[in-house]
């Protein structure tokens, strides 16, 4: 019933000319709509309880149904008239030849009650959100209940998962307290390999430790990148000997290093001779052997003598 009759806007309901008066009467009889001759008869939404009652036939009763964004009046005259009058937001529509069975079918479809009270029958039609688009009005935002609901929602949204959030100020404070090495975060416990040369921090660390020599090859701690752990404890081997010990579990053979040095010294330069190279080789070998013997005697370990190897 309601699907076949569309809502007529206010600008289409007006006064007809005298020459077309009969055409309007015949058209209204065919379509079921009864036009009104004066726009002032159409009630305004603000005065829907006053002016709309003048347009309803005598003997009918009005019940206004107010929902969110809807103002609807449904009226049926006494028995035998079979005329349905609907007033919605200032527009009045009258439908003829509307039986009670059609009204019951529409109400059952919209979820209304199908039981009609005796006497003047007045029905309320509620706007269903599932069947009709809901129109949002600005007046809803001004309601105090709406404002309180929005306030509760904002508070709940701000408090959601608050324990999992870490503020940036706290993270920055923790980052400032952490130890850094060349801009990178490092552990608070300094490792054995944290002493490098070439920076002020490394120089200060080198000054804190006295100069020592490798217990295996006798090189000074200032001539190696870092001192490493050996069989005698930490900082007892140079970088080369410590890496060899950590990878293979044995100390490296210094005789191979001596042979390499000999071959390098035996190669004559442009302005030298083979005899000069041999003399230099003997001098270097004697100095290395003497230095190694002194280091071994100082550490009390006679097994590290060059002759034993």
Curated annotation (Swiss-Prot):
User: From which residue to which does the signal peptide run?
Assistant: none
Q: What is the lineage of its organism?
A: Eukaryota, Viridiplantae, Streptophyta, Embryophyta, Tracheophyta
Annotated region Disordered: the residues are 1-35, 187-207, 290-309
Nucleus keyword on record: yes
A Pfam family for this UniProt protein? CCT
Gene field: GATA25
Query: Where are zinc fingers of the kind GATA-type found along the chain?
Result: 208-267
Q: Which GO terms describe its cellular component?
A: nucleus
Q: Report the residue ranges that make up the Tify domain in this protein.
A: 77-112
For this entry, list what GO says about its biological process.
regulation of DNA-templated transcription
Per the entry, what this protein does is: Transcriptional activator that specifically binds 5'-GATA-3' or 5'-GAT-3' motifs within gene promoters.
Please state what the protein is called: GATA transcription factor 25
Q: Name the family the entry cites.
A: Belongs to the type IV zinc-finger family. Class C subfamily.
Organism expressing this protein natively: Arabidopsis thaliana
